[in-house]
UniProtKB/Swiss-Prot annotation:
Pfam (any one): Proton_antipo_M
Molecular function (Gene Ontology), one example: NADH dehydrogenase (ubiquinone) activity
Primary location recorded for the protein, binned into one broad class: plastid
Functional note: NDH shuttles electrons from NAD(P)H:plastoquinone, via FMN and iron-sulfur (Fe-S) centers, to quinones in the photosynthetic chain and possibly in a chloroplast respiratory chain. The immediate electron acceptor for the enzyme in this species is believed to be plastoquinone. Couples the redox reaction to proton translocation, and thus conserves the redox energy in a proton gradient.
Entry membrane topology: Multi-pass membrane protein
EC number: 7.1.1.-
InterPro entries (UniProt xref): NADH_UbQ_OxRdtase_chlpt_su5_C, NADHpl_OxRdtase_5_subgr, ND/Mrp_TM, NU5C-like, Proton_antipo_N
The protein's assembly and partners: NDH is composed of at least 16 different subunits, 5 of which are encoded in the nucleus.
Keywords for the protein's UniProt record, in alphabetical order: Chloroplast, Membrane, NAD, NADP, Plastid, Plastoquinone, Quinone, Thylakoid, Translocase, Transmembrane, Transmembrane helix, Transport
Name this protein carries in UniProt: NAD(P)H-quinone oxidoreductase subunit 5, chloroplastic
Transmembrane segments: 9-29, 40-60, 89-109, 125-145, 147-167, 185-205, 219-239, 258-278, 280-300, 327-347, 354-374, 396-416, 425-445, 554-574, 607-627, 728-748
Family label: Belongs to the complex I subunit 5 family.
Entry keyword NAD: yes
Gene that encodes it: ndhF
Length: 750
């Protein structure tokens, strides 16, 4: 074990040759490097697999021995200053390294096919590998300075990948938005690190927590200042993990390629914030105000993320808000002191969300053949539907991920989420009720995605892409602005799912008309025809979405296995005296404020009681989603239920107003972006414009005015001093007159 730990420092550096060689190759041999570009996927995957095997060995040792290993090198600059750097191996490090490498390998395999057509293939793999390196360096860091360095590298890689298609203005703006938002949190983190060093004189984790505890015990530290420092440290996690109010960058980050969205949301960018809070939890625990603040921010984010997800059209933005909500659960658990539950949910959510994102990437990949490469169309759920028979493997995989995220037993997220919900009843019944209700809301918006994408007809068949009016319901240009027009024709039920608001927004509730018969013209549409010219010969092609290639399906199917079985590592049960709770062994020693006096802290009766309540709410959310989104023609009973609801609703106007308020809140992102735009962005721009005006018109005007005045005075004087004695005498008399006048006005009144 000692031998294994001695070489743990190489973990972040093993994959480093790939981005380095790609960069050198593109610089020195660009043609050959681009020609052989597909070969770079193999070393990327191979080296990360080696890291995974190394991490797996460390994890096995950690489970068996529950050890803590730290090695530090010291570089002494002078007697008063020395720099220390090293690596730290404990349970948190081993868990995160396994998570990063397993998800990273599957994303790399998936990306080889997904990005094969892209001219930036090599650049993408270099960024992606560097992203994994940065995250591995972050989780193995032994002090806060190292963490901050790798923290910034993780951020840099995420910005590069969010703005990967930088020629698209939307992607470039999303990259800038992520950068600016995270600057706020990172600046707070830097101030917190400096404040902590000022208090303790050390940033090494082996000394830091002990020094803080001693200072508090001896009452030698200002608690208010220490709380402020801890709050600044937490600000970094708020921004990185997209917690309220610094969450606004996360949905816009979906402008990057889908594989990087999977990696960001599963194991790197947003996981970094959770990791930092978990690493600093011994510091936060001694400050109850900070712990309560973490839990409060977590519960707000849980609710906000769920409510903002219920009316989004973009499939990736829906999943982004879902990630935001699930990260809120993890932050809530850490704020409650439930360390095990938070890390358990981090693990299960990572694999489930990676599965959902790679599944959505497969859907987007198949839709691009029909609607083009514009994300406004290929990611728009309004244009999907009926994909079950076209992409059955993706559909089944996506359903598994959806059931897991909803918390349906026995899938992975059920065990972790319900452990958080169970602990929340011990912490605060109010928080527990909110968290349980949000679990039902999670089921609603996740099945909304599933039903809109896979059920019904392929909605793109009703669109005309040439911009000319015809019998289709909508006219939409392939790349330009949306030209969406609602046309009620023959009272087709299909419009219930495609109700457009303000020419671009789709309601999340079925509206108005529920016919008993389906128009035969709708039934008879079987494929979408395009006229294609091949060297003057006109041919007609029939396009359907197709299942992804084998490499993409391989990653998805492996993640299905993880989603099915990874939850078992955290189930507390024993057989013949043997404890099979792998996660608890892995995390020993760990912090648990809610079960201090219990060896086996899972009360199965209490757990199952609370789980039954949350599962009932989950099924209620699924039922409501099916009620509104399941195609009415697929089930006559569902159609009758809709008509019954339409006839017997007490006050239709009130109901419509209520759902419109919910829809507007969700679609407009809770008006938080608008608030920031008005209160911050517009104000800052006006301030900058005023500063520019003041600088150019006032500050610069003073020296410029003096210069211009001097120039004209010189021009006037040069004509006087032309070598003529009469001019000199006249100028001399003029000066004398001025001197006499000055003397007269100054001294005559004395």
């Amino acid at each position: 074990m000692e031998y294994t730990h001695q070489y743990s420092w190489i973990i972040p550096f093993i994959p480093f040759p790939v981005p380095m060689l790609i960069g050198v190759g593109l610089l020195l041999f660009p043609t050959a490097t681009k020609y052989l570009r597909r070969m770079w996927a193999f070393p990327s995957i191979l080296l990360l697999t080696i890291v995974m095997m190394f991490s797996l060995d460390l994890s096995i040792h950690q489970i068996n021995n529950s050890s803590f290993y730290q090695y530090v090198w010291s570089w002494t600059i002078n007697n008063d200053l020395s720099l220390e750097f090293g690596y730290l191996i404990d349970s948190l490090t081993s868990i995160m390294s396994i998570l990063i490498t397993t998800v990273g390998i599957l994303v790399l395999i998936y990306s080889d096919n997904y990005m094969s057509h892209d001219q930036g293939y090599l650049r993408f793999f270099a960024y992606l590998t560097l992203f994994n390196i940065s995250m591995l360096g972050l989780v193995t860091s032994s002090n806060l300075i190292q963490i901050y360095v790798f923290w910034e590298l993780v951020g840099m890689c995420s910005y590069l990948l969010i703005g990967f298609w930088f020629t698209r203005p939307i992607a470039a703006n999303a990259c800038q938005k992520a950068f600016v938002t995270n600057r706020v949190g990172d600046f707070g983190l830097l101030l917190g690190i400096l404040g902590l060093y000022w208090i303790t004189g050390s940033l090494e984790f082996r000394d830091l927590f002990q020094i803080i505890n001693n200072l508090i015990y001896k009452n030698e530290v200002n608690i208010f200042f220490l709380t402020l420092v801890a709050l600044l440290l937490f600000c970094g996690s708020v921004a990185k993990s997209a917690q309220f109010p610094l969450h606004v960058w996360l949905p816009d980050a979906m402008e990057g390629p889908t594989p990087i969205s999977a990696l960001i949301h599963a194991a790197t960018m947003v996981a970094a914030g959770i990791f930092l809070v978990a690493r600093l939890l011994p510091l936060f625990i001694v400050l109850p105000a900070i712990m309560n603040g973490i839990a409060f921010i977590g519960i707000i984010t849980v609710v906000l993320g769920a409510t903002l997800a219920i009316a989004q059209q973009d499939i990736k933005k829906n999943l982004a808000y879902s990630t935001m909500s699930q990260l809120g659960y993890m932050m809530l658990a850490l704020g409650m002191g439930s360390y095990r539950a938070a890390l358990f949910h981090l693990i299960t959510h990572a694999y489930s969300k990676a599965l959902l994102f790679l599944g959505s990437g497969s859907i987007i990949h198949s839709m691009e053949a029909l609607v083009g490469y514009s994300p406004a169309k290929s990611q728009n759920m309004v244009l999907m539907g009926g994909l079950t028979k076209h992409v059955p493997i993706t559909k089944t995989s996506f359903l598994v991920g959806t059931l897991s995220l909803c918390g349906i037993p026995p899938f992975a997220c059920f065990w972790s989420k319900d452990e958080i919900l169970n602990d929340s009843w011990l912490y605060s019944p109010i928080f527990a009720i909110i968290a349980c209700c949000t679990a039902g809301l999670t089921a609603f918006y996740m099945f909304r995605i599933y039903l809109l994408v896979f059920e019904g007809y392929l909605n793109v068949h009703f669109l005309n892409f040439n911009g000319k009016k015809n019998s289709s319901f909508y006219s939409i240009s392939l790349w330009g602005k949306k030209e969406v027009k609602q046309k009620l024709k023959n009272k087709n039920f299909f419009l219930a799912l495609l109700r457009m608001k303000n020419n671009e927004m789709t309601s999340f509730f079925i509206r108005k008309i529920y016919p008993h018969r389906i128009n035969q013209n709708v039934k008879n549409i079987t494929c979408l025809f395009f006229d294609i010219n091949y060297f003057g010969t006109k041919k007609t092609a029939c396009l359907y979405p197709n299942e992804s290639d084998n490499t993409m399906r391989f990653s998805i199917l492996v993640l299905v296995l993880f989603t099915l079985f990874v939850g078992t590592i955290g189930i507390s049960f024993s057989y013949k005296g043997i404890d099979f709770d792998i996660l608890s062994k892995w995390l020993i020693p760990f912090i648990d404020l809610l079960h201090k006096n219990s060896k086996n802290f899972v009360d199965w009766y209490e757990f199952l009681t609370n789980a039954a309540f949350s599962v009932i709410l989950t099924f209620l959310g699924i039922f409501i989603a099916s009620f509104f989104y399941k195609p009415v023609y697929s089930d006559l009973q569902n159609l009758n239920l809709l008509n019954l609801f339409e006839k017997n609703v007490l006050n239709k106007k009130v109901a419509d107003y209520f759902q419109n308020v919910i829809y507007d809140w969700s679609y407009n992102r809770g008006y938080i972006d608008v608030f920031y735009d008005i209160s911050l962005i517009t104000s800052v721009r006006k301030l900058v414009q005023f500063n520019y005006f003041f600088d150019k018109k006032i500050i610069d005007a003073i020296p410029n005015g003096i210069g211009i005045t001097s120039f004209f005075m010189g021009e006037a004087i040069k004509y006087v001093g032309g070598g003529r004695i009469s001019s000199y005498i006249l100028l001399y008399i003029f000066y004398i007159v001025i001197f006499i006048l000055i003397w007269y006005f100054l001294f005559t009144n004395i």
